[in-house]
Amino acid sequence: MAGVNEIRSTFLDYFRKNGHEVVPSSPLVPRNDPTLMFTNAGMVQFKNVFTGLEHRSYNRATTSQKCVRAGGKHNDLDNVGYTARHHTFFEMLGNFSFGDYFKEDAISFAWNLITREFGLPKDKLLVTVYHTDDDAANFWKKIAGLSDDRIIRIPTSDNFWAMGDTGPCGPCSEIFYDHGDHIWGGPPGSPEEDGDRFIEIWNLVFMQFEQQTPELRIDLPRPSIDTGMGLERIAAVLQGVHDNYDIDLFKALIRASEEATGVKAEGDFRASHRVIADHLRASSFLIADGVLPSNEGRGYVLRRIMRRAMRHAQLLGAKEPLMWRLLPALIREMGQAYPELIRAESLISETLKLEETRFRKTLERGLGLLSDASENLAEGDRLDGETAFKLYDTYGFPLDLTQDALRQRGIAVDTEGFNVAMERQKAEARANWTGSGEAATETIWFGIKDKVGATEFLGYETESAEGVIASLVRDGVEVPSVREGETISVVVNQTPFYGESGGQQGDTGTISGEGFVIAVKDTQKKGEGVFVHIGEVTEGTAKAGDVVELKVDSARRTRIRSNHSATHLLHEALRETLGTHVAQKGSLVAPDRLRFDFSHPKPISAEELEAVENLANEIILQNAPVTTRLMAVDDAIAEGAMALFGEKYGDEVRVVSMGTAKHGSKAGKAYSVELCGGTHVRQTGDIGLVRIISEGGVAAGVRRLEALTGEAARLYLEEQDERVKAIASALKTTSADVLDRVNALIDERKKLERELADARKKLALGGGSSDGGSAVEAVNGVNFLGKIVTGVSPRDLKPLADEGKKQVGSGVVLFIGVGEDGKASAVAAVTEDMVGRFSAVDLVRAASAALGGAGGGGRPDMAQAGGPDGAKAADAIAAVKALIA
């Protein structure tokens, strides 16, 4: 029986032998397409090739594409776990022709693969074609020898594919597998087509038309092919099972889930194991491709998937985070085909564990509320939308999690009421919001762009230039002129000023003309390519149409260049030190410092930080040239340039390279290569020095570095050196010996603390106490030692109580420690022969009550508690004595 990995390899090798380029799967976050939530089909990475906007070095391709369908139009989340073939994550096998072969070859390739390579019986196969596609029908007869009754003509859009209202389109031909008459269902196009007997395994799309208008469709000059076969579906057929979750890959993941929970995938628990197996794949691959759980966008879809799996883990009785424990099983099954799982294993594991830990308590409270709210609901009833919204708003329950939790009881959710509650909250938030008023004026820049065009940026080559004022804006209104003392925004036809973007702050400087000067305090990009210089008129009057000279604050720009280039070096150094899972999550490039946010699941050690800093400074010392090139985005990424997934890039991108790598697989190649529109130093040596000054966490799975470069780094080190000298002087030693002196003082302090603690213990166990309490006394014939002590930590009370038990021989001991803050800790101990008469837990609870506390716990022979009112320590001793009496 062929396994999933073997089936994938057979498919790709077959098309490689038939002249196709084997193209790696693109990431789940589509490159250069922010309109698409996730990659959901094999053709996504070739969209621009099909439309003619992009050209590749090959005209035939084959892929096994990672896909996610959860959220938006393509959302399979609700059905996952309950049906045989729904998944949030799946692999799409495909072959593509870009103006090369067409219908006859596509049908021939498909038929030969499934009947010869895969060995499927021909009498189990039938196909559909679009009802007017005589060519496809005739080719199926010619190549496959199919009779007319096994070539079904479909008149609906199910067999006609379109990219949108306009653009490439064409008929489809789908291949179906007949699982046998023991399963209910009819062939496609029949009244019973929704049954499970006939299952689509491959869809061949013949792109032969271009839809120009709703009424006009013309032939494409170079018709193309796009096919898609679900790997999980064909694996089920080849492995002789009817259910995708019974293939070898899912059986391995479900087996791992069974072993981790101790619960078999049977009965009511079957769906939960399936949900966990599916959602583990989706979550792990999304995290590996740079998506982290959050409350919006792609991150929220990931969080929904993870939380749905966590709820099913809870149904299986898992008391601790489960998903991360199953990750090794996933990597064993899929790591060879997708090495990004191995590279990002640490990030995936930590993210899964942290998210589940954080959500666990909220999940339990939310499920408690849901149980109470639905207690009186019967099958067929609906949970009100207000409660569903409260679960979402207060407990972080995505709507689909609530629906899933009620599903087995046959209870629906009032989604309309949920949406009403959601809109009401948004309206209230808008009504309560008081902003700066900037948002209301943003649309003005689109109007200015339409009137005067985009600003030409000259700042890569120069820091000064001449231009013409295209527009003046004051208080959100375009004006013909501005005068001294007014705060205004200026648009010039061309500028050397960099507009804030990509984390780099905007430039400052001056704009001057005949009789006027404008001090520019910030530069922003508005609308689509309009550079807005924000500042104050310090002299004279300026008018639209005036010729001006623009001068950037060169010293400030130099510091920004240094910090921006250092950010690139630190990014690569982090990836080299921590792993290639590190990806930029945000940055700030200012003149005085830099800040860099990146994906990593745990704090960075001092040794790792030092390694990162050393690697960056190594490249700085190379004094290597910093080069920039304009390239096609796919060519840049193919050369290893790092891009931010989800960002929109133009046809051409600016690629910034610096340094030469000395280690690893990149040795001898450029050290850092990134897509970047910012300004940079000319040589790495211009950075001077980079010094990391802090590292910390800012969100789950996101860390932050702050660093200084150049003169700021030198001044920082100088300041640190002065501090060390001052410390050395205070300790009467030299800077070189200051660490030894500090360690000696620490050792001396520890010794004195031990001696002081011993002295306090001896005093506490002495024959009397100035603090209160007494020596051993008889209470109702029972030896009792009650002591009030100060200066003894709560953790030292138990050893004191053990010593006290030795003193009394047989009886009860109570020690109360009163801290400097006035709070008290109490320890009660009972000798072994007295445990049958007295419980230390009962005694210490009586003491705690007298001290204003509640509770306490431990063993019958030793228990501990506390209270806020140490002044009542004597009352606590009296309360315990009263219990003994």
UniProtKB/Swiss-Prot annotation:
One of its GO terms (cellular component) is cytosol. Gene3D superfamilies: 2.40.30.130, 3.10.310.40, 3.30.54.20, 6.10.250.550, Bira Bifunctional Protein, Domain 2, Threonyl-trna Synthetase, Chain A, domain 2. Pfam families: DHHA1, tRNA-synt_2c, tRNA_SAD. It is an enzyme of class 6 (ligase). Keywords: Aminoacyl-tRNA synthetase, ATP-binding, Cytoplasm, Ligase, Metal-binding, Nucleotide-binding, Protein biosynthesis, RNA-binding, tRNA-binding, Zinc. GO terms for biological process: alanyl-tRNA aminoacylation; negative regulation of DNA-templated transcription. The keyword Aminoacyl-tRNA synthetase applies. Coiled coil: none annotated. GO terms for molecular function: alanine-tRNA ligase activity; aminoacyl-tRNA deacylase activity; ATP binding; tRNA binding; zinc ion binding. It comes from the Bacteria. Its EC number is 6.1.1.7. It is found in: Cytoplasm. Its cofactor is Zn(2+). Binds 1 zinc ion per subunit. Its main location: cytoplasm. It catalyses: tRNA(Ala) + L-alanine + ATP = L-alanyl-tRNA(Ala) + AMP + diphosphate. Zn(2+) binds at residues 564, 568, 676, 680. Catalyzes the attachment of alanine to tRNA(Ala) in a two-step reaction: alanine is first activated by ATP to form Ala-AMP and then transferred to the acceptor end of tRNA(Ala). Also edits incorrectly charged Ser-tRNA(Ala) and Gly-tRNA(Ala) via its editing domain. Belongs to the class-II aminoacyl-tRNA synthetase family. Consists of three domains; the N-terminal catalytic domain, the editing domain and the C-terminal C-Ala domain. The editing domain removes incorrectly charged amino acids, while the C-Ala domain, along with tRNA(Ala), serves as a bridge to cooperatively bring together the editing and aminoacylation centers thus stimulating deacylation of misacylated tRNAs. This is Alanine--tRNA ligase. The gene is alaS.
